[in-house]
């Protein structure tokens, strides 16, 4: 299929060569190299970072929470979206690099957020519609599948043209609007879900199309911020020694200190 070029970056290649050591470090003298094809077998987790979760168990947790949504309209939209996107939800990252930028990252992010939303819906039950919060949490990042382009390994390579022109908030709201219309969901509920998606970045300077103006959308934006920042801490702390301070973390606009060993 032609020589390997820079355009093949982040794709899998098959190499034939000789392994030796140079100054104590293993190296390969390459005799032949080609792009891997469908006949080649390899363990994806040995080549790229993957979420530290059991995918099937985590997917079952998400499906259980969807089933627990008591409002039939919100539950129907979520079930329909799950049926259409389940396979991609199992594998795609949630970002290119900032947080959850690994295989199954979006599933991990969504599941953690839904469990947090479920807890907080009970804590603030006097003002929160649990069904709306859980549905909005499940749906908030679905359009990332369209926002990014992906390598052969499943990692994010770039933003798609639509991703650059519209972004996942607008595309997500559009899809929810279309699905709600197909299912005959009342417009007021469709608009509320669209608002949840469009406002979940909290402030326009952080990418929100509109500010969250209902309790559920405010809570969703805070849950999203919490989980994304904790994942940034997790990834940063994993590379530090106890007592060490990191270099400046761009996404946090500060350094990170590791006071103790991680749990597990």
Descriptions of predicted regions:
Residues 18-23:
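Short, charged beta-turn/beta-strand-edge "cap" motif at the junction between a beta-strand
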Residues 44-50, 100-103, 160-164:
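A ubiquitous short alpha-helical element
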Residues 98, 108, 119-240:
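Divalent metal-dependent catalytic cores for phosphoryl transfer on phosphate-bearing substrates
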Residues 74-118, 139-147:
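A short mid-domain helix/strand-loop element embedded in enzyme catalytic domains
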Residues 1-16:
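Short nucleic-acid-contacting surface segments enriched for D/E, G, S/T with interspersed K/R
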């Amino acid at each position: 299929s032609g020589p390997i070029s820079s355009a093949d970056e982040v794709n899998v290649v098959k190499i034939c060569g000789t392994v030796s050591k140079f100054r104590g470090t293993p190296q390969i003298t390459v005799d032949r190299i080609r792009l891997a094809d469908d006949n080649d077998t390899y363990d994806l987790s040995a080549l790229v970072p993957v979420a530290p979760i059991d995918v099937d168990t985590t997917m079952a947790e998400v499906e259980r929470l969807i089933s627990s949504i008591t409002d039939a309209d919100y539950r129907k939209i979520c079930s329909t979206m799950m049926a259409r996107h389940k396979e991609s939800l199992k594998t795609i990252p949630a970002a290119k690099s900032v947080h959850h930028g690994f295989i199954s990252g979006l599933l991990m992010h969504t599941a953690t957020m839904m469990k947090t939303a479920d807890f907080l819906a009970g804590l603030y039950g006097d003002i929160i519609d649990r069904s709306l919060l859980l549905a909005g949490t499940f749906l908030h990042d679905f359009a990332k599948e369209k926002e990014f382009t992906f390598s052969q390994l499943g990692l994010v390579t770039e933003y798609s043209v639509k991703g650059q022109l519209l972004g996942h908030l607008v595309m997500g709201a559009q899809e929810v609007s279309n699905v709600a219309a197909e299912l005959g969901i009342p417009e007021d509920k469709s608009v509320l879900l669209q608002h949840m998606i469009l406002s979940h970045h909290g402030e326009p300077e952080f990418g929100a199309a509109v500010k969250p103006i209902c309790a559920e959308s405010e809570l969703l934006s805070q849950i999203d911020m919490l989980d994304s920042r904790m994942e940034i801490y997790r990834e940063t702390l994993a590379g530090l020694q106890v007592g060490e301070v990191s270099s400046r973390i761009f996404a946090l606009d500060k350094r990170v200190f590791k006071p103790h060993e991680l749990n597990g």
